[in-house]
């Protein structure tokens, strides 16, 4: 039988247990028609790239399926009728990778990693509290840890 991967996005208002119920229904429907679910991953509640049916977030689920094309069309019909499913996409694949997919592999990485120096800070206020104006010479000031020795020498001369 051909192999398929199906990614479905469920509404953010439903709970994870309800998302599991949707995935269980798909699994039961595929297995009742002599198919098999080889892989099932819950990617979590994620931001959508754009609004879908007035939703900005959705629960993502990946299913790896081994089923006949008629079974897949019936599964897609059932997903289309379910009001809790915002979108789904099923593609045919050569093989189903047993390793965790990319979103799950990235989950272990630190999302708030240091992005490095991003340029000088725009001028805000002087230490005295007076706001910086257009007539002030110092438009930008670098953080102390990024200032070079040359900058420090110029500041000492002034």
Swiss-Prot record:
GO terms for cellular component: cytosolic small ribosomal subunit. It comes from the Bacteria. GO terms for molecular function: small ribosomal subunit rRNA binding; structural constituent of ribosome. The keyword Ribosomal protein applies. SUPFAM superfamilies: Ribosomal protein S6. HAMAP family: Ribosomal_bS6. This is Small ribosomal subunit protein bS6. The lineage of its organism: Bacteria, Pseudomonadati, Pseudomonadota, Alphaproteobacteria, Acetobacterales.
């Amino acid at each position: 039988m051909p192999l398929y991967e199906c990614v479905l996005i469920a509404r953010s208002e439903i709970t994870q247990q309800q998302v599991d119920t949707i995935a269980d229904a798909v699994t039961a429907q595929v297995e009742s028609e002599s198919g098999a679910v080889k892989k099932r991953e819950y990617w979590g509640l994620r931001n959508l790239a754009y609004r879908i049916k007035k939703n900005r977030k959705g629960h993502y689920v990946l299913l790896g399926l081994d089923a006949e094309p008629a079974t897949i069309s019936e599964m897609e019909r059932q997903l289309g009728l379910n009001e809790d499913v915002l979108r789904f996409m099923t593609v045919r694949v050569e093989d189903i990778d047993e390793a965790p997919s990319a979103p799950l592999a990235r989950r272990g990485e630190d999302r708030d990693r240091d992005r490095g120096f991003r340029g000088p800070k725009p001028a805000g206020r002087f230490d005295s509290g007076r706001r910086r104006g257009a007539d002030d010479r110092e438009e930008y000031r670098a953080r102390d840890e990024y200032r070079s020795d040359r900058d420090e020498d110029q500041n000492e001369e002034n």
